[in-house]
Amino acid sequence: MTAIAVAAVPLAFPAAAWAAPTDTDVPWTTYQASLDPITANHVTGSGTAMIQLSGNTAKITVTASGLVGGGSPHAMHIHVDGAGVCPKPSEAKDHNGHSSINVADAMKDYGMIGTSLTTSGDSTPKSALAVDRFPAGSSVKYSRTLEVTDNVAANLKSGKAVLVVHGIDYNGNGKYDNVLGASELDKTLPAEATDPALCGAFNVSQMTSMPGGGADTGDGATQTGSGIHTGMVAGGSAAAMVGLGIGGFALRRRGVTTR
């Protein structure tokens, strides 16, 4: 597996308001990102992300659509320590005879993984490829409260934090396959499964409300729409394989840690 450094690795929101939280004495700051498609990867989806941050507590909401469906998992991360921008189409390189952008190509732009937006359990960079604990399907509606590191909080405050949703359908056949070859992150995965699909840099927002439904107040996450359910995954070690029936590939279950 090609090593990648890990830190220390928008649809308009509905008008319904959710009042700023009052469960801490530390002021809350709202950050918002418009998630735009990585067009070099033949993506047409869009989305929005919002974070309310108080100290190291982050109430995170992501809404997206136009992604690969059929239960395909979409890893989502807050990237840090880069330039705080998303890759341009001109940065595409040749991958298996096709012009596209993979994770490594864009790392200088959005940086390394700081937080993995898993639906449960561990949310550190160790869970970067924990495919059974990421949202799945063509649309995502994600909400979770997490504790982020000092470095992730600092990157949000400095405008260097970027949200990236991964997983593309470059050849338009509705599933992940090897049209772009193997992923540079894990040779057992197709590149389509890990290449960036949507990207957006976080900026301080003037909004003082969360999307309709709001962020939850516990550690768990909510996600609506089609997707993979943890009941489909057999328990086991970090090497346990998750058969997803997409393009004949089995996606590796990584870094599964529950709290």
Language-model segments: residues:
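N-terminal leader/targeting pre-sequences
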Residues: 1-257
